[in-house]
Regions:
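Phosphate-coordination/substrate-recognition cap region in phosphate-metabolizing enzymes
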Residues: 1-63
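Beta-strand elements within well-structured catalytic alpha/beta cores of enzymes
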Residues: 2-3, 99-107, 111
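Flexible loop/turn segments at secondary-structure boundaries
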Residues: 9, 112-113
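Extended recognition/assembly regions associated with phosphoester-bond processing machinery
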Residues: 12-13, 108, 136
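Hydrophobic, Leu/Ile/Phe/Ala-enriched alpha-helical segments that form helix-helix packing faces
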Residues: 12-24, 87-95, 115, 119, ...
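Acidic, low-complexity terminal tails and accessory targeting/binding regions
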Residues: 22, 40-53, 97-101, 113-172
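Extended, charge-rich low-complexity interaction segments
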Residues: 58-82, 164-172
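A mid-sequence, solvent-exposed acidic-amphipathic segment
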Residues: 69-103
Length: 172
């Protein structure tokens, strides 16, 4: 399990693991470690220079900031595709390699909103698009190497996919 280092995210991860463990009658003997990852902190995965980007977050609020980010219109920020690919690669590299593995990544609504918008090719996010409390994105990868893999995801009941390599080419 990976999590933003913010305590409420670490606590959420621990409670989700506890809830999953209690959903079965079988005794669990595993110990799932929660590894804190800076790329999952808000809006850490997308920021290059917080002194440049920070004032825009305070001025625009989360929704305005993420809309500016997905349009690559903020100073001190990574290109949206680069920022999202960094997070996706983290998820790819921390996923268990066996066929029955499942991993959990706990982050913030702003990170989730940005990822969903960018991988969906959207340039505008509305309040209705914004992730609800505890709403999650289900992702998986097909392929043995990240850059050659296909990302598949389910968001609000819709299944989508994209080639990581082709996605990265859109940055140019």
């Amino acid at each position: 399990c990976i999590s933003s280092p913010i305590q409420r995210c670490v606590d959420t991860a621990a409670l989700m693991i506890q809830g999953a463990d209690s959903s079965t009658l079988a005794q669990n003997t595993h110990c799932i470690e929660i590894v804190e990852q800076g790329l999952l902190v808000e809006p850490g995965s997308f920021v290059l220079d917080i002194k440049q980007a920070g004032p825009y977050f305070r001025k625009q609020g989360a929704l305005g900031f993420i809309n500016s980010f997905v349009n690559n219109a903020l100073p001190g920020m990574k290109h949206p595709i680069t920022g999202v690919v960094d997070v996706l690669e983290l998820i790819y590299n921390t996923h268990p390699q066996d066929h029955f593995g499942l991993s959990l990544a706990v982050s913030h609504d702003t990170i989730l909103a940005a990822i969903i918008a960018v991988i969906s090719g959207r340039h505008t996010i509305t309040r209705e698009d914004w992730p609800k409390m505890m709403e999650g994105l289900f992702v998986w990868f097909e392929g043995d190497k990240f850059l050659e893999s296909k990302l598949k995801w389910i968001w609000r009941g819709q299944v989508n996919e994209l080639s990581i390599r082709e996605f990265q080419k859109l940055e140019k």
